[in-house]
Protein backbone atom coordinates (compact mmCIF):
# COMPACT_ATOMS: atom_id res chain seq x y z
CA UNK A 1 0.00 0.00 0.00
CA UNK A 2 1.43 3.38 -1.07
CA UNK A 3 2.22 5.71 1.79
CA UNK A 4 0.16 8.93 1.74
CA UNK A 5 2.22 12.08 1.21
CA UNK A 6 2.17 14.40 4.20
CA UNK A 7 0.64 17.81 3.42
CA UNK A 8 2.38 20.83 4.93
CA UNK A 9 0.97 24.36 4.66
CA UNK A 10 2.91 27.53 5.41
CA UNK A 11 1.90 30.93 6.79
CA UNK A 12 4.14 34.02 6.92
CA UNK A 13 3.20 36.35 9.75
CA UNK A 14 4.19 38.72 12.55
CA UNK A 15 1.50 38.07 15.19
CA UNK A 16 1.94 41.50 16.73
CA UNK A 17 -0.03 40.39 18.65
CA UNK A 18 -1.85 37.14 17.76
CA UNK A 19 -5.59 37.79 17.41
CA UNK A 20 -8.83 36.04 16.45
CA UNK A 21 -8.24 36.79 12.77
CA UNK A 22 -4.97 34.87 12.93
CA UNK A 23 -6.65 31.90 14.59
CA UNK A 24 -9.32 31.99 11.87
CA UNK A 25 -6.62 32.06 9.17
CA UNK A 26 -4.84 28.99 10.60
CA UNK A 27 -8.13 27.10 10.80
CA UNK A 28 -9.09 28.07 7.21
CA UNK A 29 -5.62 27.20 5.92
CA UNK A 30 -5.88 23.71 7.39
CA UNK A 31 -9.40 23.33 5.99
CA UNK A 32 -8.59 24.57 2.45
CA UNK A 33 -5.38 22.58 1.99
CA UNK A 34 -6.12 19.50 4.08
CA UNK A 35 -2.83 20.15 5.87
CA UNK A 36 -1.36 17.65 8.30
CA UNK A 37 0.71 20.47 9.76
CA UNK A 38 0.66 24.27 9.59
CA UNK A 39 4.13 25.83 9.66
CA UNK A 40 4.47 29.52 10.53
CA UNK A 41 7.44 31.69 9.59
CA UNK A 42 7.28 34.64 11.99
CA UNK A 43 9.27 37.83 12.51
CA UNK A 44 11.53 37.92 15.52
CA UNK A 45 11.41 40.88 17.89
CA UNK A 46 11.12 43.63 15.26
CA UNK A 47 8.51 43.86 12.50
CA UNK A 48 8.23 44.82 8.85
CA UNK A 49 6.95 48.37 9.42
CA UNK A 50 10.20 49.19 11.22
CA UNK A 51 8.86 48.89 14.75
CA UNK A 52 9.48 46.63 17.72
CA UNK A 53 7.04 43.83 18.46
CA UNK A 54 4.82 44.50 21.48
CA UNK A 55 6.07 41.34 23.16
CA UNK A 56 9.00 39.07 22.40
CA UNK A 57 9.11 36.26 19.84
CA UNK A 58 8.86 33.49 22.46
CA UNK A 59 5.60 34.83 23.87
CA UNK A 60 4.22 35.33 20.35
CA UNK A 61 5.33 31.80 19.43
CA UNK A 62 3.37 30.46 22.40
CA UNK A 63 0.33 32.48 21.25
CA UNK A 64 0.59 30.99 17.75
CA UNK A 65 0.93 27.39 18.97
CA UNK A 66 -2.01 27.80 21.35
CA UNK A 67 -3.93 29.29 18.41
CA UNK A 68 -3.49 26.25 16.16
CA UNK A 69 -0.04 26.46 14.53
CA UNK A 70 2.08 23.29 14.66
CA UNK A 71 5.54 24.79 14.15
CA UNK A 72 6.97 28.32 14.36
CA UNK A 73 10.25 29.31 12.68
CA UNK A 74 11.94 32.70 12.94
CA UNK A 75 12.20 34.93 9.88
CA UNK A 76 15.76 36.34 9.94
CA UNK A 77 15.99 40.03 10.82
CA UNK A 78 17.51 40.98 7.45
CA UNK A 79 14.18 40.03 5.83
CA UNK A 80 11.87 40.92 8.70
CA UNK A 81 12.72 44.64 8.72
CA UNK A 82 12.81 45.10 4.94
CA UNK A 83 10.36 46.17 2.24
CA UNK A 84 7.22 44.14 1.54
CA UNK A 85 9.00 42.54 -1.44
CA UNK A 86 12.00 41.41 0.62
CA UNK A 87 9.83 40.38 3.59
CA UNK A 88 7.75 38.21 1.26
CA UNK A 89 10.82 36.80 -0.48
CA UNK A 90 12.41 35.87 2.84
CA UNK A 91 9.24 34.19 4.07
CA UNK A 92 8.78 32.17 0.88
CA UNK A 93 12.49 31.27 0.82
CA UNK A 94 12.22 29.99 4.40
CA UNK A 95 9.22 27.80 3.55
CA UNK A 96 10.84 26.58 0.33
CA UNK A 97 14.07 25.77 2.20
CA UNK A 98 12.20 23.32 4.43
CA UNK A 99 11.68 21.21 1.31
CA UNK A 100 8.24 19.95 2.33
CA UNK A 101 5.78 22.88 2.17
CA UNK A 102 3.08 22.43 -0.50
CA UNK A 103 1.16 25.69 -0.14
CA UNK A 104 1.32 29.12 1.46
CA UNK A 105 -1.88 30.66 2.83
CA UNK A 106 -2.30 34.36 3.44
CA UNK A 107 -5.10 36.75 4.30
CA UNK A 108 -5.91 39.51 1.83
CA UNK A 109 -8.63 42.00 0.99
CA UNK A 110 -9.28 40.94 -2.64
CA UNK A 111 -8.26 37.32 -3.42
CA UNK A 112 -9.70 37.61 -6.93
CA UNK A 113 -7.18 40.28 -7.97
CA UNK A 114 -3.93 38.92 -6.50
CA UNK A 115 -2.75 37.30 -9.76
CA UNK A 116 -3.35 40.50 -11.74
CA UNK A 117 -1.49 42.59 -9.16
CA UNK A 118 1.41 40.13 -9.07
CA UNK A 119 1.85 40.31 -12.86
CA UNK A 120 1.76 44.12 -12.84
CA UNK A 121 4.17 44.39 -9.91
CA UNK A 122 6.51 42.05 -11.78
CA UNK A 123 6.37 44.40 -14.76
CA UNK A 124 7.14 47.55 -12.77
CA UNK A 125 9.95 45.94 -10.78
CA UNK A 126 11.65 43.62 -13.28
CA UNK A 127 10.87 44.63 -16.87
CA UNK A 128 12.64 47.56 -18.51
CA UNK A 129 9.48 49.34 -19.66
CA UNK A 130 7.95 49.22 -16.20
CA UNK A 131 11.16 50.18 -14.43
CA UNK A 132 11.57 53.27 -16.65
CA UNK A 133 7.95 54.28 -16.06
CA UNK A 134 8.43 53.98 -12.29
CA UNK A 135 11.57 56.14 -12.50
CA UNK A 136 9.48 58.75 -14.28
CA UNK A 137 6.96 58.76 -11.44
CA UNK A 138 9.79 59.09 -8.90
CA UNK A 139 11.13 62.10 -10.82
CA UNK A 140 7.69 63.68 -10.39
CA UNK A 141 8.13 63.36 -6.61
CA UNK A 142 5.87 60.34 -6.04
CA UNK A 143 6.76 57.93 -3.24
CA UNK A 144 7.24 54.31 -4.28
CA UNK A 145 3.79 53.19 -3.04
CA UNK A 146 2.10 56.12 -4.83
CA UNK A 147 4.04 55.39 -8.02
CA UNK A 148 3.07 51.73 -7.96
CA UNK A 149 -0.58 52.62 -7.44
CA UNK A 150 -0.41 54.94 -10.46
CA UNK A 151 1.23 52.15 -12.49
CA UNK A 152 -1.48 49.69 -11.42
CA UNK A 153 -4.22 52.10 -12.50
CA UNK A 154 -2.66 52.69 -15.91
CA UNK A 155 -2.14 49.00 -16.65
CA UNK A 156 -5.53 47.74 -15.43
CA UNK A 157 -7.83 50.64 -16.26
CA UNK A 158 -9.28 50.32 -12.77
CA UNK A 159 -10.67 53.46 -11.17
CA UNK A 160 -8.49 55.45 -8.79
CA UNK A 161 -10.74 54.38 -5.91
CA UNK A 162 -10.46 50.67 -6.79
CA UNK A 163 -6.67 50.93 -7.09
CA UNK A 164 -6.48 52.66 -3.73
CA UNK A 165 -8.60 49.89 -2.20
CA UNK A 166 -6.46 47.19 -3.81
CA UNK A 167 -3.23 48.70 -2.48
CA UNK A 168 -3.95 47.33 0.99
CA UNK A 169 -1.21 45.52 2.93
CA UNK A 170 -2.71 42.03 2.56
CA UNK A 171 -3.11 42.36 -1.20
CA UNK A 172 0.38 43.81 -1.63
CA UNK A 173 1.98 40.99 0.36
CA UNK A 174 -0.09 38.40 -1.52
CA UNK A 175 1.18 39.75 -4.84
CA UNK A 176 4.74 39.75 -3.48
CA UNK A 177 4.41 36.11 -2.34
CA UNK A 178 3.41 35.21 -5.91
CA UNK A 179 6.44 37.02 -7.28
CA UNK A 180 8.79 35.35 -4.79
CA UNK A 181 7.50 31.91 -5.78
CA UNK A 182 8.09 32.80 -9.43
CA UNK A 183 11.62 34.08 -8.71
CA UNK A 184 12.54 30.91 -6.85
CA UNK A 185 10.95 28.59 -9.42
CA UNK A 186 8.99 27.01 -6.58
CA UNK A 187 6.03 24.68 -7.07
CA UNK A 188 4.40 25.99 -3.88
CA UNK A 189 0.74 26.94 -4.31
CA UNK A 190 -0.73 30.25 -3.14
CA UNK A 191 -4.03 29.97 -1.26
CA UNK A 192 -5.44 33.45 -0.53
CA UNK A 193 -8.04 33.76 2.23
CA UNK A 194 -10.44 36.70 2.34
CA UNK A 195 -9.60 38.93 5.30
CA UNK A 196 -12.53 39.16 7.72
CA UNK A 197 -13.37 42.04 10.04
CA UNK A 198 -11.26 45.17 10.44
CA UNK A 199 -8.88 46.52 7.83
CA UNK A 200 -5.15 46.29 8.54
CA UNK A 201 -4.78 49.87 9.81
CA UNK A 202 -8.32 50.23 11.18
CA UNK A 203 -8.56 51.16 14.85
CA UNK A 204 -12.29 51.75 15.44
CA UNK A 205 -14.95 49.06 14.77
CA UNK A 206 -17.46 50.14 12.12
CA UNK A 207 -19.51 46.99 11.59
CA UNK A 208 -20.53 43.98 13.65
CA UNK A 209 -17.84 41.63 12.28
CA UNK A 210 -15.15 44.16 13.22
CA UNK A 211 -15.69 43.35 16.90
CA UNK A 212 -15.03 39.65 16.25
CA UNK A 213 -11.97 40.14 14.04
CA UNK A 214 -10.11 43.20 15.28
CA UNK A 215 -6.87 44.35 13.68
CA UNK A 216 -3.51 44.12 15.44
CA UNK A 217 -3.36 47.92 15.09
CA UNK A 218 -6.61 48.26 17.06
CA UNK A 219 -5.43 45.83 19.73
CA UNK A 220 -2.16 47.69 20.21
CA UNK A 221 -4.17 50.92 20.58
CA UNK A 222 -6.42 49.27 23.19
CA UNK A 223 -3.34 48.19 25.11
CA UNK A 224 -2.59 51.88 25.78
CA UNK A 225 -5.27 51.60 28.49
CA UNK A 226 -4.12 48.26 29.91
CA UNK A 227 -4.82 44.56 29.41
CA UNK A 228 -8.38 44.95 30.71
CA UNK A 229 -9.31 46.96 27.60
CA UNK A 230 -7.96 44.43 25.07
CA UNK A 231 -10.55 42.67 22.93
CA UNK A 232 -10.24 40.54 19.81
CA UNK A 233 -7.60 38.11 21.08
CA UNK A 234 -8.08 34.43 21.97
CA UNK A 235 -8.14 34.10 25.75
CA UNK A 236 -5.04 31.86 25.77
CA UNK A 237 -3.06 34.40 23.73
CA UNK A 238 -4.12 37.31 25.94
CA UNK A 239 -3.23 35.29 29.03
CA UNK A 240 0.26 34.59 27.62
CA UNK A 241 0.72 38.33 27.08
CA UNK A 242 -0.49 39.12 30.61
CA UNK A 243 1.94 36.57 32.04
CA UNK A 244 4.78 38.24 30.13
CA UNK A 245 3.79 41.43 31.94
CA UNK A 246 4.86 44.11 29.45
CA UNK A 247 4.15 45.84 26.15
CA UNK A 248 6.99 47.49 24.23
CA UNK A 249 7.01 50.58 22.00
CA UNK A 250 9.68 51.56 19.51
CA UNK A 251 10.42 54.78 21.42
CA UNK A 252 11.68 52.53 24.25
CA UNK A 253 14.66 51.84 21.97
CA UNK A 254 15.41 55.49 21.15
CA UNK A 255 18.69 55.78 23.14
CA UNK A 256 20.31 52.87 21.29
CA UNK A 257 18.80 53.91 17.94
CA UNK A 258 20.12 57.46 18.34
CA UNK A 259 23.54 56.15 19.33
CA UNK A 260 23.73 53.93 16.23
CA UNK A 261 22.74 56.82 13.95
CA UNK A 262 25.48 58.99 15.43
CA UNK A 263 28.22 56.34 15.50
CA UNK A 264 27.55 55.19 11.93
CA UNK A 265 26.91 58.58 10.35
CA UNK A 266 29.83 58.17 7.92
CA UNK A 267 28.55 54.91 6.44
CA UNK A 268 24.77 55.35 6.47
CA UNK A 269 24.42 54.86 2.71
CA UNK A 270 25.84 51.33 3.03
CA UNK A 271 22.65 50.19 4.76
CA UNK A 272 19.80 48.67 2.83
CA UNK A 273 17.09 51.32 2.54
CA UNK A 274 19.27 54.38 3.24
CA UNK A 275 19.60 56.49 0.10
CA UNK A 276 21.97 59.47 -0.06
CA UNK A 277 19.01 61.79 0.49
CA UNK A 278 17.82 59.87 3.55
CA UNK A 279 21.36 59.64 4.94
CA UNK A 280 21.65 63.43 4.71
CA UNK A 281 18.33 63.86 6.53
CA UNK A 282 19.38 61.38 9.26
CA UNK A 283 22.72 63.15 9.75
CA UNK A 284 21.04 66.54 10.05
CA UNK A 285 18.07 65.65 12.23
CA UNK A 286 19.92 63.43 14.72
CA UNK A 287 21.69 66.60 15.91
CA UNK A 288 18.46 68.55 16.32
CA UNK A 289 15.76 66.32 17.83
CA UNK A 290 15.67 64.59 21.19
CA UNK A 291 13.01 61.89 20.87
CA UNK A 292 11.94 59.11 18.51
CA UNK A 293 8.58 60.49 17.35
CA UNK A 294 10.05 63.91 16.54
CA UNK A 295 12.90 62.27 14.65
CA UNK A 296 10.83 60.03 12.38
CA UNK A 297 8.42 62.87 11.55
CA UNK A 298 11.32 65.19 10.76
CA UNK A 299 12.81 62.57 8.41
CA UNK A 300 9.63 61.75 6.47
CA UNK A 301 9.45 63.53 3.11
CA UNK A 302 7.07 63.65 0.17
CA UNK A 303 8.74 60.70 -1.53
CA UNK A 304 10.06 58.80 1.52
CA UNK A 305 7.35 57.06 3.54
CA UNK A 306 7.26 56.86 7.31
CA UNK A 307 7.56 53.05 7.15
CA UNK A 308 10.74 53.32 5.10
CA UNK A 309 12.22 55.82 7.55
CA UNK A 310 11.50 53.49 10.48
CA UNK A 311 12.86 50.41 8.67
CA UNK A 312 16.00 52.28 7.67
CA UNK A 313 16.69 53.28 11.29
CA UNK A 314 16.51 49.63 12.38
CA UNK A 315 18.69 48.60 9.45
CA UNK A 316 21.36 51.03 10.66
CA UNK A 317 21.15 49.61 14.19
CA UNK A 318 21.38 45.98 13.05
CA UNK A 319 23.72 46.74 10.13
CA UNK A 320 21.47 45.26 7.44
CA UNK A 321 23.15 45.97 4.12
CA UNK A 322 21.98 45.74 0.52
CA UNK A 323 23.11 42.36 -0.79
CA UNK A 324 22.16 39.99 -3.58
CA UNK A 325 19.16 37.90 -2.67
CA UNK A 326 19.92 34.49 -1.27
CA UNK A 327 18.67 31.47 -3.19
CA UNK A 328 18.86 29.28 -0.11
CA UNK A 329 18.25 30.00 3.54
CA UNK A 330 21.55 29.32 5.36
CA UNK A 331 19.72 28.27 8.54
CA UNK A 332 16.25 28.22 10.05
CA UNK A 333 15.65 28.65 13.74
CA UNK A 334 12.71 26.71 15.17
CA UNK A 335 11.16 28.79 17.94
CA UNK A 336 8.51 26.29 18.96
CA UNK A 337 6.23 23.38 18.13
CA UNK A 338 3.27 21.44 19.40
CA UNK A 339 4.00 18.13 21.14
CA UNK A 340 1.44 16.35 18.97
CA UNK A 341 2.49 17.98 15.67
CA UNK A 342 2.89 15.81 12.60
CA UNK A 343 6.67 15.32 12.08
CA UNK A 344 8.05 17.47 9.26
CA UNK A 345 9.54 15.43 6.39
CA UNK A 346 12.80 17.37 6.12
CA UNK A 347 14.67 14.78 4.04
CA UNK A 348 14.79 17.08 1.00
CA UNK A 349 16.04 20.10 2.95
CA UNK A 350 19.68 21.19 2.92
CA UNK A 351 19.02 23.97 5.44
CA UNK A 352 20.18 23.38 9.03
CA UNK A 353 17.27 23.66 11.47
CA UNK A 354 18.46 25.16 14.74
CA UNK A 355 16.61 24.52 17.98
CA UNK A 356 18.65 25.52 21.01
CA UNK A 357 21.40 28.00 20.11
CA UNK A 358 23.89 26.86 22.71
CA UNK A 359 23.95 23.35 21.23
CA UNK A 360 23.57 23.97 17.52
CA UNK A 361 25.10 27.34 16.57
CA UNK A 362 28.43 25.63 15.82
CA UNK A 363 26.82 23.81 12.90
CA UNK A 364 27.22 27.07 10.96
CA UNK A 365 30.40 28.72 9.77
CA UNK A 366 31.62 31.87 8.03
CA UNK A 367 29.02 34.30 6.68
CA UNK A 368 26.15 32.00 7.70
CA UNK A 369 27.20 32.30 11.34
CA UNK A 370 27.51 36.08 10.96
CA UNK A 371 23.93 36.27 9.69
CA UNK A 372 22.69 34.31 12.69
CA UNK A 373 24.71 36.64 14.94
CA UNK A 374 22.70 39.55 13.49
CA UNK A 375 19.46 37.88 14.64
CA UNK A 376 20.94 37.21 18.07
CA UNK A 377 22.04 40.84 18.38
CA UNK A 378 18.52 42.04 17.50
CA UNK A 379 17.09 39.78 20.21
CA UNK A 380 19.70 40.96 22.74
CA UNK A 381 18.80 44.60 22.09
CA UNK A 382 15.11 43.77 22.58
CA UNK A 383 15.67 41.81 25.81
CA UNK A 384 17.88 44.60 27.19
CA UNK A 385 15.19 47.22 26.53
CA UNK A 386 12.51 45.05 28.16
CA UNK A 387 14.67 44.61 31.26
CA UNK A 388 15.41 48.34 31.46
CA UNK A 389 11.73 49.28 31.08
CA UNK A 390 10.22 46.69 33.40
CA UNK A 391 12.91 45.57 35.83
CA UNK A 392 12.30 41.97 34.72
CA UNK A 393 15.34 39.67 34.39
CA UNK A 394 17.00 40.01 30.99
CA UNK A 395 16.52 36.97 28.75
CA UNK A 396 19.60 35.29 27.29
CA UNK A 397 19.20 33.89 23.76
CA UNK A 398 21.66 31.10 24.51
CA UNK A 399 19.60 29.90 27.45
CA UNK A 400 16.20 30.01 25.75
CA UNK A 401 14.56 26.68 25.03
CA UNK A 402 12.09 26.00 22.26
CA UNK A 403 8.49 26.74 23.19
CA UNK A 404 6.64 23.41 23.47
CA UNK A 405 2.84 23.42 23.75
CA UNK A 406 0.35 20.58 24.17
Q: Model-found features: residue ranges?
A:
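Receiver (REC) domain switch/active-site residues of two-component response regulators
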Residues: 36, 70, 102
Amino acid sequence: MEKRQVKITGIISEYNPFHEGHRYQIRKAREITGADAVVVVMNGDFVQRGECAVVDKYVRTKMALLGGADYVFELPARYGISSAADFAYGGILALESLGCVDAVCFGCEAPEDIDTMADIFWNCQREEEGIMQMKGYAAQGLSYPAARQRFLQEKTGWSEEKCRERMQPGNILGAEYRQAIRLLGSSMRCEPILREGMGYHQVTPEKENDWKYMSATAIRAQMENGFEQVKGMPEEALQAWKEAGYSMKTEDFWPVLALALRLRKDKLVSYKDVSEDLAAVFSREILQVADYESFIHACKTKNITMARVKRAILQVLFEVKAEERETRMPYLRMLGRRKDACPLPLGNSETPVIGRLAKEEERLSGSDKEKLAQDIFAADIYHMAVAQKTGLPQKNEYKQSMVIVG
